[in-house]
């Protein structure tokens, strides 16, 4: 006779997390390996944790791509890399005026955080000064929180960004350390961890996450969440691979919507007090179950991503309202 596997009590696990009991890697793997029919129970349990720490608030973030393409790195997932043949817009730095204009567009989209992103391995000091000039004007004229994502930083650059008023610095780990060489050869996993630590040491809130669906195992997927816990990332963007034509990963099978939901739930269980953001690939990978993702996550991007389109801001606002949730404006 076939043995019936005992179902996990996901609610009990959630209340254990709320009571600050330690979740194990085995617990995280169990979430990822659970039968798809359990997904609503898992998301309901994740919501217990999410609601305890964040209530019904949803934080909106907006990206501006201030420098597109022209990157010397060979990241296999990225349409902006030197080896990509994807047909994207390529341009050098936007003017400070354009960057500041983008901040006011972020406000119109009800975003509380404005993310200034530039392609490339690392910024020059001149480029950092260019960003700082825009940041200072934005700080003087808005209440937005500012996040930067400019590549690898040295200690001096991190310090100057902090002094200028940058609240958060994004530098994703992208994938598990064991999987890193399969997606990039021009820098290492440790290089990425180093920049996250430099930003934190400078007094900037660290933002770091991953792109799921790049060939990592279930166990590695869980270990990524614990690694983000270890480096104490305050904000964790969960991206889901969009297999862009013209990139080395164009043939990679994308995750199913339920697999994406399990990742979001697992991330909430492992990092209960952190901002969990549904990021790149949200519309393409989660599709019609996007709203369910917000029962684990408490943050999304509004508008377009770096080189892929997002849905209209009104659709995001409507989704949040339909759930009975509320937009958290201008709060980090």
UniProtKB/Swiss-Prot annotation:
Instruction: Output the InterPro entries linked to this UniProt entry.
Output: Aldolase_TIM, BATS_dom, Biotin_synth/BioAB, Biotin_synthase, Elp3/MiaA/NifB-like_rSAM, rSAM
Q: Write down the SMART domains for this protein, in alphabetical order.
A: BATS (SM00876), Elp3 (SM00729)
Binding residue positions for [4Fe-4S] cluster: 71, 75, 78
- An individual GO BP term: biotin biosynthetic process
Tell me the residue numbers annotated for binding [2Fe-2S] cluster. 115, 147, 207, 277
Instruction: Tell me how the cofactor is bound.
Output: Binds 1 [4Fe-4S] cluster. The cluster is coordinated with 3 cysteines and an exchangeable S-adenosyl-L-methionine. Binds 1 [2Fe-2S] cluster. The cluster is coordinated with 3 cysteines and 1 arginine.
Q: Cite the entry's keywords alphabetically.
A: 2Fe-2S, 4Fe-4S, Biotin biosynthesis, Iron, Iron-sulfur, Metal-binding, S-adenosyl-L-methionine, Transferase
The broad enzyme category this protein falls into is transferase
Q: EC number(s)?
A: 2.8.1.6
Assembly and partners are described as: Homodimer.
Q: What is this protein called?
A: Biotin synthase
Q: Which organism is it from?
A: Bacillus cereus (strain AH187)
Give the organism's phylogenetic lineage: Bacteria, Bacillati, Bacillota, Bacilli, Bacillales
